[in-house]
Amino acid sequence: MLEEEILQKLQKFGLTKYESLAYLTLLKLGPSKATDVTKESGIPHTRIYDVLSSLARKGFVDIVHGTPRLYAPVNPEIVLEKIREDLISDIERLKKAFQELYREVHGEELPEIWTVHGFENTIDRAQHIIRSAKHDILINTPYEFLEYLRGVLEKRNDVLIIVISNFSEIPLWLRNKNNVILARSGQAPWLLGTWVIGDINYALFFGTLPEDKGKERFYSFWVKSTRLIQNYVHWFYTMYFDNSEIVKPLNYERMEKPLTLSHIRTVITVLKQAGLPRNIEVIGRSLADKKQVTIKGKVIDYEYTPLTANITVKTDNKKIKVGGLGSYLEDIEGESFILLD
């Protein structure tokens, strides 16, 4: 790296031109008097003491007190490590500040979307979603890709799993799982894209499966954003599930209770198979004052269309309409739905 380029990099890290020049000069000379630094670097004599004192405050120079006073450069590895730590700290603080500013305006978190390169990495991410989900897993994929997820899916008996695929017959390894709903997808090509969603925390999606020669160049999209994923869940149902044929219903009575679900459309999908009424606890926010609320009661009805999805909960003294995130017609915006029986 040329000397001029080094000086430019140091200035990017917060040093002035004279400070960068003085530190570089000390690296060449070793411990030196201020007059020697002036002579070698060309920094004006009237400025050199202020420059060296500033470098000492910033951790680039040690002052050796004595007669004459010497200035020694701090080991570059120590200096660069401190710069790295400070940069990371500043970036994290900025990230937090930006997110808070964004929320003040938009009322939601910054969407986080990454591109995942490589087919094996995509499989790893999909398996991670299945392993880490706490309440429900939604999958739409060709059966060929579903086989890559078999190992982790077989181990999950504690969460609701809904799988849409181009089944020719029900796989034996899924047939006897009480917590699984299976649906056979329509045959339109756009119905064969892959979506893997865990709760409303993580989502992975991609188009067609790659041929062997294209697996290294393959990429998918990884999403972490509650507000964004709730839209994906909406599309999962209205685009895929509602246009598919259920080939294996949920064995609701054999599932462990209470059963916590993360999206209103998932709740209604379960209620359609479990039947009404059902005792439920809902944690969410009142649309009237935006305050956190918890209600308990019986689900006595539901409404489910491509545009709306809500349940009617009867408490001791009234009927309450509960929707999901983004609700605007209901009384409560539900965030967590707990079926009690």
UniProtKB/Swiss-Prot annotation:
DNA-binding region range list: 32-53
Gene Ontology terms for molecular function: DNA binding
Keywords: DNA-binding, Repressor, Transcription, Transcription regulation
Pfam families (UniProt xref): Regulator_TrmB (PF11495), TrmB (PF01978)
Induction remark: Autoregulated.
InterPro entries: TrmB-like (IPR051797), Tscrpt_reg_TrmB_C (IPR021586), Tscrpt_reg_TrmB_N (IPR002831), WH-like_DNA-bd_sf (IPR036388), WH_DNA-bd_sf (IPR036390)
Regulation affecting activity: Repressor activity is regulated by binding of different sugars to TrmBL1. Binding of maltose and maltotriose results in derepression of the target genes. However, high sugar concentration results in formation of octamers with high affinity for DNA, which may prevent transcription of target genes.
Family stated for the protein in its record: Belongs to the transcriptional regulator TrmB family.
Domain notes: Contains an N-terminal DNA-binding domain and a C-terminal sugar-binding domain.
Subunit structure: Homotetramer. Forms homooctamers in the presence of maltotriose or maltose.
NCBIfam families the UniProt entry points to: TransRegTrmBL1
Protein name in the entry: HTH-type sugar sensing transcriptional regulator TrmBL1
Protein source organism: Pyrococcus furiosus (strain ATCC 43587 / DSM 3638 / JCM 8422 / Vc1)
Function: Global transcriptional repressor of the maltodextrin transport gene cluster (mdxE operon) and most likely of all genes encoding glycolytic enzymes. Acts by binding to the conserved TGM (Thermococcales-Glycolytic-Motif) sequences in their promoter region. Can also interact with non-TGM sequences.
